[in-house]
Amino acid sequence: MPLQKNQILILRIERLSSDGSGVAHSADGEAVFVPGTAPGDEARVRIVKDCGRYAFGILDELLTPSPDRIPVDCPVAGPCGGCSLRHLDYAAELRAKQESVLDAFRRIGGLEVPVLDILPSPEVDRYRNKVQFPVGVDKNGAPCIGFYAGRTHRIVPCPDCRLQPGVLNEIGNALCAFFAQQGIRPYDEQSGKGLVRHIFLRRGAHSGQIMVCLVCTRAKLPHAEQLCIALREQFPAISTILLNVNAKNTNVILGGENHILYGPGYIEDTLCGVPVRLGPLSFYQVNTLAAERLYGVAAQYAQLTSDDALLDLYCGIGTIGLSMADQCRELIGVEIVPEAIESAKANAARMGEAVAAKSRFFCADAGQAATQLAAEGLHPDIVMLDPPRKGCDEATLSAVVRMAPRRVVYVSCNPATAARDAAWLEKNGYHAEKVQPVDLFPRTKHVEAIVSLQREI
C-alpha cells in the first residue's frame, strides 16, 4: 500500500544515501529517505511524498538518537543545508562516505574493485579557501551575507559559516556594514533592482593572501576607493580587490567582465609545491591541504617514469599535472576555460625553464581534444582524467582507449559517474585496480575518489 502524505511512521535509520539523507524502510519494505538523520536513529518520521518504490520524509521527532550523533554547533545548519552531515561524528561521516563509494562501484559500475580506507581531511572545519556569499537583507532590512536555503533562492543569513576561515566571514560582514553605511543595496531577483549580488572571496592556504571580488549588476561601485582603503586597513592580508559585472538574469554567479580596484587582480599560493595564481575564474580545489593528499595519491597511481608523456585532461590551472612534471618527459594539459589555460602556462613558467620547456597547454573541450590527439596518433603513457561531476562522455573515453596509455588515473568528485566510466573502461581493455576515497568536503555529503586503471591489452 502506498504511503500517504503526512502519514507518521516509526523508523530506524539504517544508512546514509549518497545525498546525505538517512535511509529507512517501511513495514512493506519501501525505502524512505529522511534528511538530518543518522544511522542508528530511531525516529518519528512524517511522509511528505511517496514516489512508488520509495518515499521522502522529514524528521518529526527523534526518539532514540544514534551514538554517532553530535551536537550541531551552527544555528543555521538546518535551514542553510550546506552542512548536511554536521550532526554526525566525523568518524561516522567517513564510514558513510566510504560506504557510498563502495556502493557506487558495486551497484552502478558492477565492479568488485578494492575500495581503500578513506583518507580524512586534515581539517574538519574552516578548511575552505573559497566562499561565494550571496548578499541579501536580514529581518531588519540590512545587507547581510548568507547562503540559499535548499532548493530555493531565499537567503539564510549566516554571519559565521564554520566551513570558512574566520577572516573570510569577517570580511563579508565588514562589506555588508559598509554597504549599509553607504546606502548600497543588495540585488533583488524579484524586482531586478539593487547592485551587489555576491561577495566572492579566496584565501591562499599557504600564502595567506586574500582576494575580494564583488559581483555587481554594473561596473561602477559607489565609494569604491573609500571601500578599498577601509578593507586594506582592517584586513592587511587582502592583496587584491575586483569588481565583477553580472547584469544577466541568471543563476551563474560570475559574469565575464572584471575590473581591478586594487592590486594585481589575483592572489598567489602553492599546491604540492606548484606556484599558482588564482583569479575569480580559476578552478581550484577548495580544500588545499586535503587536495595535496589527493594529488599525492594520483601521483602514486600514475607510476610515472622519466621517459613518460603525461596527458592531463580537464587540467584546470594545471596543478595536478604540474605537480608531477618533474617525474615525466612531457606534460600536455587540456582545459576549456581560456583563463585557466593562461594560468596553467604562467604556473609552468614560474616553476622554471625545465618545466616550462616540457609542458604544453591547450584551450579546448577535453573530449574534442582527446579525439583530435588520438587521430593525430598521440600515444601518451599516462592519462589523467579529472572531469566535472557529470563525468566523461563516451567520445572522450573512446579517444583515451585509442591512444592506448599504459595507465589511466581518474580523479572524480562524483563516485557514481566515476563508477560508470570505470566500468566502460573495464569493458574496453582496462582493469580497475583500486579506488581511493578522499574527503575534501567534511560536514557535507560530497566525497572524492581516485581510480587506478591499468591497460590489459
Spell out what each predicted region is.
Residues 1-72, 76, 361, 367:
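Terminal RNA-binding accessory module
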Residues 2-7, 12, 18, 219, ...:
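Rossmann-like S-adenosyl-L-methionine
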Residues 22-27, 146-149, 213-215, 344:
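Short, acidic/hydrophobic/Gly-rich beta-strand patch recurrent on exposed beta strands
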Residues 40, 164, 287:
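Short, conserved phosphate/pyrophosphate- and ester-handling motifs at nucleotide-, phospho-/glycolipid
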Residues 44-46, 132, 311:
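Hydrophobic beta-strand signal
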Residues 199:
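Flexible loop/N-cap segments at domain edges
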